[in-house]
Design a protein with these regions (language model features):
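Bacterial N-terminal signal peptides
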Residues: 13-21
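Extracytoplasmic copper-binding redox domains, predominantly the cupredoxin/blue-copper superfamily
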Residues: 25-297
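Coiled-coil-like amphipathic alpha-helices with heptad-repeat character
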Residues: 4, 23-24
Length: 297
């Protein structure tokens, strides 16, 4: 039987063909692996800032830094003059209140409308950035160290807290910790919620119609009141018993902002003027900020 044999020239041609096929498979294998493409190295380099993609990454980081900064400033709100000491409130007309306060170990109830510390520090002021910052929403509150929800409790015939700040559209939880009737009335908003016993209610988009101060009242217990101050951004602070405050996370970029202070007794206190602060090189130029009310009697 006759058999065909390869010529040397045919063998060379077959070897060349096999080499081409093998090279093609290797190229395909590399392209299927992360970073194995012939463009993989260029893409990685760009993400590190050497190309167009890198420029985009730097820009995004810069934008985030603008919004979520690290600048903070401190200060104090003080009172000059001779403000009176807080008076004890008479709750004898509602004996259930005294019993409930004993049960909660709250002690006697004193007026909270003008509480001044030993060195003149004024409690329960809202200090806030009024100009220079825009575009913040209620969802940003947690990012800036504030609670996602504001809680108002009716406990021992007293609103707790007495003063609070809230952003428009922020969720509010209204609680009644007492086993008897209370109500939360906010005349400026046309709002009135009766709560006959222990319980709570969530109210979304509660303070969504007005900015500034809103008084909360209980018509059952007329001495009960609290104040909400509706702010436009999360850059605010409430003063403690020493009148001191801290506002955190201002943008790192250079800028100028207006700072104001609010207190419920503005009618008997000559309010201080707004102040401007300047951020430069990641710090507040003015340092510690002092607001000074004057008590008029």
């Amino acid at each position: 039987m006759k058999m065909d044999c390869f010529s040397p020239r045919s063998a060379v041609a077959v070897a060349a063909l096999l080499a081409l096929l093998f090279a093609g498979c290797e190229t395909k294998k590399q392209a299927s692996q992360p970073g194995g493409s012939q463009y993989g190295k260029a893409t990685s380099t760009a993400s590190e800032g050497s190309g167009e993609a890198g420029t985009g990454a730097v820009s995004t980081a810069s934008s985030a830094k603008e919004k979520f900064g690290s600048v903070s400033f401190t200060g104090q709100v003080k009172v000059t003059g001779a403000p009176p000491a807080p008076v004890e409130l008479d709750t004898s007309a509602k004996p259930e209140c005294g019993k409930q306060r004993q049960a909660f170990e709250q002690g006697t109830l004193s007026a909270e409308n003008l509480v001044v510390g030993a060195d003149g520090g004024l409690k329960d002021c809202i200090v806030f950035i009024s100009k220079g910052l825009k575009g913040y929403k209620a969802k940003d509150m947690v990012t800036y160290g504030h609670p996602a929800k504001v809680v108002i409790d009716q406990k021992g015939c007293q609103y707790i807290p007495h003063v609070f700040a809230v952003m428009a559209d922020q969720e509010v939880v209204i609680k009644n910790s007492d086993p008897f009737l209370h109500n939360v009335s906010i005349p400026s908003l046309g709002f009135n919620l009766s709560m006959p016993s222990v319980g709570e209610e969530n109210r979304a988009r509660f303070f969504n119609r007005k900015t500034g101060s809103q008084v909360c009242q209980c018509s059952v217990h007329p001495w009960m009141n609290a104040y909400a101050y509706v702010v436009k951004n999360p850059f605010f602070s409430k003063t403690g018993g020493d009148g001191k405050f801290t506002i955190n996370k201002l943008p790192d970029a250079d800028g100028t902002y207006t700072v104001e202070v609010w207190h419920e007794k503005d009618r008997k206190l000559k309010a201080p003027k707004a102040q401007k602060i300047t951020v430069k090189d990641g710090a507040v130029v003015e340092g510690n900020i002092v607001f000074e009310f004057t008590y008029k009697g």
